[in-house]
Amino acid sequence: MPLFTLPAVTIQSAKAMNELHYRITRRVSECISHANLTLNTEFSAPAIRFDIRGKTAGMALLQRWQLRFNPVLLAENPDAFIEEVVPHEVSHLIVFARFGRVRPHGKEWQSVMSQVFDVQPKTTHSFDIKSVEGKTFPYHCECDVIPLSVRRHNKVQRQQVQYVCRRCKQPLVWKPSSP
């Protein structure tokens, strides 16, 4: 009896992910090269990882000169990743290198997005996140049922925080369902 089981990954899906990783890596290189040409700089290509989980599409680790991407959202939205997420994250690195610590989506970042990469500077993605959404707990108020994440639910249970409804301003209460 095996101690663990491997996920069912087909050769075709592995090849598809390798192709997507290659496309992302190539797009990152193109963005860096374009920024170097446009801004007369010599930025090196960042390290790239595909290990983010949850709802986050991408992340720039500024001091490490590293980009991280969500492989699930990438597989579900490859074209949008290449056209929007990669320039978004590369812009964070460029802004950090040129201006230091500034507001993450401030005027410097917006300028790099629009003037260097010719991409609309959106701060969030609009991908369907059903496949990466975690478990939620139904909390009730006087006007609605509001799902809270595991993290927020645990904070409520430890009495570290109490959430209130934005509409009716009443406290959110968890009513566990009976078995």
Regions found by a protein language model. Name each.
Residues 2-80, 99-179:
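Metalloprotease/metallohydrolase-associated module, dominated by Zn2+-dependent proteases
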Residues 84-96:
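Active-site recognition of the HExxH zinc-binding catalytic motif
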